[in-house]
Amino acid sequence: MLLHIPGLFDADELARIREALEQADWADGKATAGYQSAKAKHNLQLPEGHALAKEIGSALIDRLWKNPRFMSAALPHKVFPPLINCYREGGNFGFHIDNALRQPKGSPERVRTDLSSTLFLSDPDSYDGGELVIQDTYGEQQVKLAAGDLVLYPGTSLHKVNPVTRGVRYAAFFWTQSLVREDSQRALLFEMDNAIQQLTADVPEHPSLLQLTGTYHNLLRRWAEV
């Protein structure tokens, strides 16, 4: 399941973020890649724990925790702190699958990468190329969103970033360990939750709503890992 979550940052915030990123000291993106992924990774990245990355990441997570669509789809349990990357002309990241487990720097806890997220920070007209290409059950999906928009997709997906041929592509990315590890089960719960919310708006007093809501929570109780 691919999910588009729009408008997490406004134009003024994004302009300030990009101005700060233009002045930042970048490191080789291979530093946070696994052995196989490093062979395909050609980009720049703010070092893990960088003050600017922490500031952007904290604001992003705070907004997502208040976003009903994200919470319903991801059912988050743990999050790997967001990282920030930069693709300049020629930068790309070939097809790869993210490592199954991530351990934040300085933390004893590991995060299972059930879900991957990318927040686009550059206006799509400001660079050519740089599409996020995700392979799913419906074939290849090319994603190039407006600045401030996020895409959420299964961590099991084969994906790549096409070469940037003009301009600079800034983005934030992170991984979520869900309460429900199986994508098909999360998708079913997301659809059911959406249906419950729509029915609540349309027929708020319908007696079947109580039963349907109970079924949702019983499925979540069966599948959740805490």
Curated annotation (Swiss-Prot):
This is PKHD-type hydroxylase PputW619_4316. Fe cation binds at residues 96, 98, 159. It comes from the Bacteria. It is an enzyme of class 1 (oxidoreductase). PROSITE patterns: FE2OG_OXY. 2-oxoglutarate binds at residue 169. One of its GO terms (biological process) is intracellular iron ion homeostasis. Pfam families: 2OG-FeII_Oxy_3, PKHD_C. Residues 78-178 form the Fe2OG dioxygenase domain. Its cofactor is Fe(2+); L-ascorbate. InterPro entries: Oxoglu/Fe-dep_dioxygenase_dom, PKHD_C, PKHD_hydroxylase, Pro_4_hyd_alph, Pro_4_hyd_alph_FE2OG_OXY. Binds 1 Fe(2+) ion per subunit. Keywords: Dioxygenase, Iron, Metal-binding, Oxidoreductase, Vitamin C. Its EC number is 1.14.11.-. One of its GO terms (molecular function) is 2-oxoglutarate-dependent dioxygenase activity.
